[in-house]
Design a protein with these regions (language model features):
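C-terminal catalytic lobe of FAD-dependent flavoproteins
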Residues: 165, 288, 292-303, 307-413
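N-terminal Rossmann-like FAD-binding beta1-loop-alpha1 element of flavoenzymes
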Residues: 32-57
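Glycine-rich active-site loop/strand segments that organize a redox cofactor
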Residues: 70-101
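Active-site substrate-recognition segment that forms the wall
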Residues: 115-123, 210-250, 254-346
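Extreme N-terminal leader/targeting segments of oxidoreductases
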Residues: 1-32
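Glycine-rich FAD pyrophosphate-binding loop
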Residues: 50-70
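Flavin (FAD/FMN) cofactor-binding and adjacent substrate-gating region
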Residues: 2-13, 81-87, 110-177
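Helical element adjacent to the flavin cofactor pocket in flavoenzyme catalytic cores
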Residues: 160-201, 205-214, 219
Length: 417
């Protein structure tokens, strides 16, 4: 599956790249080659170079063209798998260590995102988890309906929990600033290389790149899986959708009077936030099967917002507010919802499968992979416990689609009964 590519709001508000895509001498030698210019690949390359290794980072298109640069811009602790799933896969004794690793990733991101150097990442603290179900958690931090309406006014939202350690930001700007930092430490960033394949000595690309390297890390996420027959069997590309409205600051002041980001607790629920120019970013849905054209994503977005904010949409229609941007992106999911990280063969390693929760997990696992590749054999010990389960291609995608619809039905019942 490939996502329908269209220009995003991030593209139109991004900083200019602060690096020049490198030219590689034919058969140039490197210690490591990283395939994939998202957050995982950049982090791995950065931390390898920090340890003195020579590193080339290859990107099929542009840095941030994949999920890392076109997601909703949410960063929190945790993983795509919930704690029950984590305990079932790796064992209860290791779940606390796994949770700590997710928190370490969040702290790594916060340290950069809120620094002066990363000011264009426009980081804002606070994410509110919204509940639509009638089952309110027994938590002293829960915002009841009346308190919740200080932050969001929508008839279906019953309760909320504020996470002040989480934040939202401009992911493409973050990535471009980090790429500049990565290049300055000595990594050769090579963009627009096309499709790649490996051989006994290194990497060859359809764009004419031919380089030698000792080890290769695949950090392609939901993109580029066709280039690696092993990862293609272990990870499914799952599509999700985002739209952005035209500016409507006054309307948002009434219905979403907070600068914190918001998202509901459903497995494939909605996530949304105000953007600095007065627009609303709205994320929605997943699909393992369908490729939606842009006009359908726009229509779906408007109807989705209306289903949760009918009064707000009435004002939007009155003021002729439109959906100015709509796009899709591919997340990489393994069947157990945990990352596929570790050794593929003697020379190749995988760093993917973050499942829509990669803004904290991808950079910290990029760092751990770099530690592993430079001699710390214990840095990935948790991931040796995660089984490599086949996803079975089309059958797996069909199964994922059925599972999504099953979970959606459960969410529907929990909201009404």
């Amino acid at each position: 599956m490939s996502a329908v590519h269209s220009r995003t709001w991030y593209d139109d508000t991004s900083v200019s790249p602060g690096w020049q895509s490198s030219q590689v001498i034919h058969n140039e030698n490197f210690d490591f080659c990283i395939i994939g210019g998202g957050l995982a690949g950049l982090s791995c390359a950065y931390h390898l170079a920090e340890k003195g290794a020579s590193v080339a980072l290859l990107e099929k298109s542009d840095i941030g063209a994949g999920a890392s640069g076109r997601n909703g811009g949410f960063c929190s602790t945790g993983w795509a798998a919930n704690n029950l799933q984590i305990c079932r896969v790796i064992g209860e004794n290791y779940s606390t260590e796994f949770e700590a690793l997710g928190l370490e990733g969040l702290n790594w991101m916060r340290q950069r995102a809120f620094s002066r150097r990363y000011s264009k990442a426009e980081a804002v603290s606070g994410v509110i988890s919204l509940g639509l179900s009638k089952n309110t958690p027994e938590d002293l931090k829960v915002l009841t309906k009346d308190k919740l309406e200080e932050f969001v006014i929508g008839p279906r939202y019953r309760w909320g929990i504020v996470d002040k350690s989480a934040f939202h930001f401009h992911p493409l700007n973050f990535l471009r600033i980090f790429a500049e930092e990565t290049e300055k430490i000595g990594v050769k960033i090579i963009e627009n290389i096309g499709l790649v394949k490996t051989n006994k000595t290194g990497v060859i690309s359809s764009g004419g790149i031919n380089l030698r390297c000792k080890r290769i890390v695949w950090a392609t996420g939901g993109y580029g899986l066709d280039s690696n027959s092993i990862l293609k069997k272990l990870v499914l590309p799952i599509q999700t959708f985002i739209c952005v409205t035209s500016p409507m600051g006054a309307i948002l002041d009434k219905y979403i009077p907070t600068n914190m980001a918001l998202g509901d607790e459903r497995r494939a629920g909605n996530y949304f936030r105000r953007l600095p120019d007065g627009r609303l970013l709205w994320g929605m849905g997943v699909s393992a099967m369908q490729q939606k054209p842009i006009h359908k994503i726009r229509s779906m977005g408007f109807q989705n917002i209306k289903a949760h904010f009918p009064d707000m949409v009435h004002h939007m229609e009155k003021d002729r507010i439109t959906i100015d941007y709509a796009w899709s992106g591919l997340m990489a999911y393994a069947s157990h919802f945990l990352p596929v990280v570790g050794q593929i063969n003697d020379r190749e390693f995988s760093l993917c499968g973050f499942g829509g929760h990669g803004m904290n997990t991808a950079p910290i696992l990029g760092k751990k992979m770099a530690n592993f590749l430079t001699g710390d054999s214990n840095s990935l010990h948790l991931f040796s416990r995660i089984p490599k389960q086949k996803t079975y291609g089309l059958l797996g995608r069909l199964g994922a689609e059925i599972e999504y619809r099953r979970l959606s039905f459960i969410d529907y019942l929990s909201e009404r009964y």
